[in-house]
Each structure stands twice: as C-alpha cells, then as structure tokens.
Amino acid sequence: MGKNQKNKKEEKWADKAGSLSQERKIREKEIEEKGDIHLKNWGQMTLEGNEGKRRIHLLSIIGEVEGHENASGNAKTTKYDHVLPMLAQIEDDAQIEGMLVLLNTSGGDVDAGLAIAEMIASMSIPVVSLVLGGSHSIGVPLAVASDHSFIVPSGTMMVHPVRMSGMVIGTAQTYEYFEMIQDRILNFV
C-alpha cells in the first residue's frame, strides 16, 4: 500500500472518530434536555449540587391532585399516575439519600392524594415537606405524610369534611364509605 493510500485511510478513520465524538456530544445534550423535560413535565429532579454532595430528590405537588378523573386541559395538576411510579423508583434507588416535597395545592382527588400520601409515609429515606402557599383539602395528608413538615409564614392549610360530586345515593353504604375515607384522612392528621 502506498503512502498516499495510507494517509487517506488515516484521514478516513480520523473523520469517523471525530464524527463519533460529535454524535456522543449530541446524545449527551439530548439526555440533559430530557432531564429538563422531566422537570418541566413532572416537577421532579434530583438535587446534587449541595455542600455535602448528597442526592436529594425534589418532588413538587402543585395545583390540583389529579386522579382517575381528568381535570380540564388548562388546569395545573399533579397526576398521581406519574408520581407513584416515580416514588417507587426513588425507593429503589440506593443512591438517593432523601426527598424534599414542595407543596402548593388546592387539593383534588381524595383516593389519588391518599395513595401518594401513603407512599410518601412508607419511604425508607428521610422525607421533608415544605408548604409554599397552600396545602388544602387532600394536601393536608400529603404535607404531614413526611418525616418532617414545614410551612412558610404566609402559608395556609385547610381541611374539610369529604365531599363528592355527581349523584350520591343516600344509603347506609354511602355514609360508611364517606366515614372510611374520612378515617383514612384523619390517620395522617
């Protein structure tokens, strides 16, 4: 093989290596953007830049807690079917050392909120909640499900009797169901 052919092959390999390096940079940027999208879509991220280099997961519960019934498209919601798998993933990740829950919610679906609260209460890592603004209705059990709960001086919390929308049949079973839900809520408070 001539010297000219050898130089062309080396140039070709150098171009491929440069192209692979460029592709790697593009992939790394996509991964970084996906993390940003994850934060944008679900209000969750892992905080790592603190003084002790501890990995703390940030979970925000903002707006209405959405359960099986979808809220209107223009309402800010926290969807429990996104939060529950994330909580399971956090519990499974040995590198995450704690969780900070930020709350500003008007409440929402009782069953969905209680499911999230029960998952938060069962976490093996330390969990701290911070109420920013308000944590009303089903937001109260969400706030107190953590190991330590804090509220800003201007924050508010309000709990009220369970209500249902739609047609409710006035039977003993309906009353028992209301009582059961109320007891589940009171167990947290």
Protein language model annotation of sequence segments:
Residues 1-140, 144-189:
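N-terminal organellar transit peptides
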